[in-house]
A protein has these predicted regions:
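Polybasic low-complexity intrinsically disordered regions
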Residues: 1-72
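Helix-centered, glycine/charged polyanion-binding patches within enzymatic domains
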Residues: 59-129
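Alpha-helix capping/termination and helix-coil
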Residues: 46-49, 74, 130, 160
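A short, polar/proline- and glycine-enriched secondary-structure boundary/capping micro-motif
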Residues: 33-38, 89-90, 173
């Protein structure tokens, strides 16, 4: 609760690798368009011994700004296009079929679904087991600290699972909680 009696809301955009582990994040107030967070996130991550070849995202990231940011860094993207009246989406891109499914070239659908599943898996784990969506501290810096702590726990679980010789538990926050 803020001092004015209004609830302060923040959002976090994070990049997840193909194994479903976070690579980095950036936080902003809830009223900032998520598309504006893509470039700062890529600036922070790309070049720090991290090579990004392909990015998958929801249709909300379909914009020239995002596509230009990815193209300037030589990163391919699998982002479905929204269906808009008066616009015919090219057949070589994914299009949103309904809220969850996409249609388009089969190879892009397979890639998109696999990468989105890893991202959604991380979202589900941190929201259900680490109360990620119940952030109560004030301030954007505290939101960043909250994200860092949550991701430290995610990595700690993976490390402990490896040390125990139980790689099947690397995603199981509940097992170690």
């Amino acid at each position: 609760m803020g001092t004015t009696g209004k609830c302060a809301r923040y959002q976090s955009l994070f990049l997840v690798d193909v194994e479903g582990f976070p690579l980095g994040h950036v936080e902003a107030p809830a009223n900032v368009n998520e598309k504006k967070l893509v470039e700062p996130l890529l600036d922070r991550l790309v070049g720090e011994n991290i090579e990004v070849e392909l990015v998958a995202g929801d249709s909300q990231f379909e914009s020239e700004q995002v596509f230009d940011a990815l193209k300037s860094r030589k990163i391919s993207s699998v982002i479905p296009w929204r269906r808009l009246k008066g616009r015919e989406n090219p057949s070589c891109v994914l299009s949103v079929k309904d809220r969850i499914d996409v249609e388009g070239p089969e190879h892009l659908r397979v890639i998109y679904k696999a990468l989105r599943a890893k991202s959604e898996s991380l979202n589900g784990r941190v929201k259900a087991r680490l109360a990620y969506s119940r952030f109560t501290w004030q301030g954007l810096q505290n939101a960043c600290i909250h994200s860092c702590l949550v991701f430290c726990v995610v990595y700690a679980v993976a490390i402990v699972a490896a040390l125990l010789g139980r790689p099947e538990l690397q995603y199981s926050i509940a097992y170690f909680a």
